[in-house]
C-alpha cells in the first residue's frame, strides 16, 4: 500500500486525484471517497468547479447525488497533481494527450498514472499507452481501468464490476485496494495492458452499430448477431496487437460491449439509434448533448485496422456512415450481402 503523506496543500493524506469532472470522473471520485479516502476531483473550468463546491453535487451530470465529505473540489491543476502519488485520468480520448501534457510539469518523482479514458489517439489510432510514453517517458507506472460502468449507477452505489491492468503489479494491487468496495464495487486484476485499452475503444463503435440496427427496426436477432460479430472483430484486432484472447471475454471486452450495446444510458447506442432513424450525424450528436466517444473512436479504430491489415466489416460500414455519408440501411444491406464465411473467420 502507498504510505500516508500529509505534506501537501491540504494537510491530509490524499488517496487519489481524479483528473476530469465529467459524469464518469465525478462518479469514480464519489465512489472512491465513499470508501473513506480523501479524494481530489479536478476540472478545467473554474466556474463549473465552483458550482460543484457550492452545491456539493454535480447537478448537471449526476442530479440528486451528494458528494461525500472527503471529496475535495479543485480547479488548480498543480495543487491537484502534487497532492497525491496516484492520478486517475478520466477525460475524453481526444484530449487525453493534451491533459496529460498539462499535468507533466507538476508530476512528482513517485507519481503513478491510471486512466479510465476509453479510446485511441485521434488521427493516428494509437493506444493511449503510446501517447503517455511520448509525453512523460517510461519512468512512471501506468495503468488502465476499464469495464461495464454507467456513471449514474456507479455514483448511486449500485453493484458494479470493473478491471484494472498495468505492467506494474504493485500498482494494480494498490488500485484494487483503493477502488474496491466489497458492498458495491468489485475490481478485478488483469495483466493484459494492451487488450484492456483496446476493448473500451472498439465497444463504443459496435454500440453505435447496435443502436443503428435498432433504429432501423431490425430487432433483437440482428442486435445480438451484431454484438457477437463485433466481439469477433474486437478479438481479431486484439490478436494482431498482441492482446490476450481471454481479455475480450472479460469486463473490458464482452462485459462493456453488452452493456453499451443494449442499454439506452449509452450515448453511443442512442447516437446510433438516431442515425438508424434517418437523422444526420450533426443532428444525432446535438440530441445527445454530451460527448459521443464512439464518433471519434470509429475513425481511430478504422485507421488502426487498416494499418494492421485486420478485416473489420462492421467497423468499416459504421465508418462509411459517419464519415462518408452512407445511408445506415445501405450499410446494413452491404453487411448482410457479404460472402459466406465460417463463423471463426
Curated annotation (Swiss-Prot):
GO biological process: carbohydrate metabolic process; glycerol-3-phosphate biosynthetic process; glycerol-3-phosphate catabolic process; glycerophospholipid biosynthetic process
Protein residues bound to NADPH: 23-24, 44, 118, 151, 267, 291, 293
Record localization: Cytoplasm
UniProt xrefs under InterPro entries: 6-PGluconate_DH-like_C_sf, 6PGD_dom2, G3P_DH_NAD-dep, G3P_DH_NAD-dep_C, G3P_DH_NAD-dep_N, NAD(P)-bd_dom_sf
Active site as annotated: 203
Pathway: Membrane lipid metabolism; glycerophospholipid metabolism
UniProt-listed Enzyme Commission number(s): 1.1.1.94
Binding sites annotated in the UniProt record for sn-glycerol 3-phosphate: 118, 147, 149, 203, 256, 266-268
EC class: oxidoreductase
Reaction(s) this enzyme catalyzes, per UniProt: sn-glycerol 3-phosphate + NAD(+) = dihydroxyacetone phosphate + NADH + H(+); sn-glycerol 3-phosphate + NADP(+) = dihydroxyacetone phosphate + NADPH + H(+)
Superkingdom of origin: Bacteria
Cellular component aspect of the GO annotation: cytosol
Keywords: Cytoplasm, Lipid biosynthesis, Lipid metabolism, NAD, NADP, Nucleotide-binding, Oxidoreductase, Phospholipid biosynthesis, Phospholipid metabolism
Functional summary from the UniProt entry: Catalyzes the reduction of the glycolytic intermediate dihydroxyacetone phosphate (DHAP) to sn-glycerol 3-phosphate (G3P), the key precursor for phospholipid synthesis.
Protein family membership: Belongs to the NAD-dependent glycerol-3-phosphate dehydrogenase family.
Protein name: Glycerol-3-phosphate dehydrogenase [NAD(P)+]
Organism the protein comes from: Vibrio campbellii (strain ATCC BAA-1116)
Gene assigned in the entry: gpsA
Amino acid at each position: 500500500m502507498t504510505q500516508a503523506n500529509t505534506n501537501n496543500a491540504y494537510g491530509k493524506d490524499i488517496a487519489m486525484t481524479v483528473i476530469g469532472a465529467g459524469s464518469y470522473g465525478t462518479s469514480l471520485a464519489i465512489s472512491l471517497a465513499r470508501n473513506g479516502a480523501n479524494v481530489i476531483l479536478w476540472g478545467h473550468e473554474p466556474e463549473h468547479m465552483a458550482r460543484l463546491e457550492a452545491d456539493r453535487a454535480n447537478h448537471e451530470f449526476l442530479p440528486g447525488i451528494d458528494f461525500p465529505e472527503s471529496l475535495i473540489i479543485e480547479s488548480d491543476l498543480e495543487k491537484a497533481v502534487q497532492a497525491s502519488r496516484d492520478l486517475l485520468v478520466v477525460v475524453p480520448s481526444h484530449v487525453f494527450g493534451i491533459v496529460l501534457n498539462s499535468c507533466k510539469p507538476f508530476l512528482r518523482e513517485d507519481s503513478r498514472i491510471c486512466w479510465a479514458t476509453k479510446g485511441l489517439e485521434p488521427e493516428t489510432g494509437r493506444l493511449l499507452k503510446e501517447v503517455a510514453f511520448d509525453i512523460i517517458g517510461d519512468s512512471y507506472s501506468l495503468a488502465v481501468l476499464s469495464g461495464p460502468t454507467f456513471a449514474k449507477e456507479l455514483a448511486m452505489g449500485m453493484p458494479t464490476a470493473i478491471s484494472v491492468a498495468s505492467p506494474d503489479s504493485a500498482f494494480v494491487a494498490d488500485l484494487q485496494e483503493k477502488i474496491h468496495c466489497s458492498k458495491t464495487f468489485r475490481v478485478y486484476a488483469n495483466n493484459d495492458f494492451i487488450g484492456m485499452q483496446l476493448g473500451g475503444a472498439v465497444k463504443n463503435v459496435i454500440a453505435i452499430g447496435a443502436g443503428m440496427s435498432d433504429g432501423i427496426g431490425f430487432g433483437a436477432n440482428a442486435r445480438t448477431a451484431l454484438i457477437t460479430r463485433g466481439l469477433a472483430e474486437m478479438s481479431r484486432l486484439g490478436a494482431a496487437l498482441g492482446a490476450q484472447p481471454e481479455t475480450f471475454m472479460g469486463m473490458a471486452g464482452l462485459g462493456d460491449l453488452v452493456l453499451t450495446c443494449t442499454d439506452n444510458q449509452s450515448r453511443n447506442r442512442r447516437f446510433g439509434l438516431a442515425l438508424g432513424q434517418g437523422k444526420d450525424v450533426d443532428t444525432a450528436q446535438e440530441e445527445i448533448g454530451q460527448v459521443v466517444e464512439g464518433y471519434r473512436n470509429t475513425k481511430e479504430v478504422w485507421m488502426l485496422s487498416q494499418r494492421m491489415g485486420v478485416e473489420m466489416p462492421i467497423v468499416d460500414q459504421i465508418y462509411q456512415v459517419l464519415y462518408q455519408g452512407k445511408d445506415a440501411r445501405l450499410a446494413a444491406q452491404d453487411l448482410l450481402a457479404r460472402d459466406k464465411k465460417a463463423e471463426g473467420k
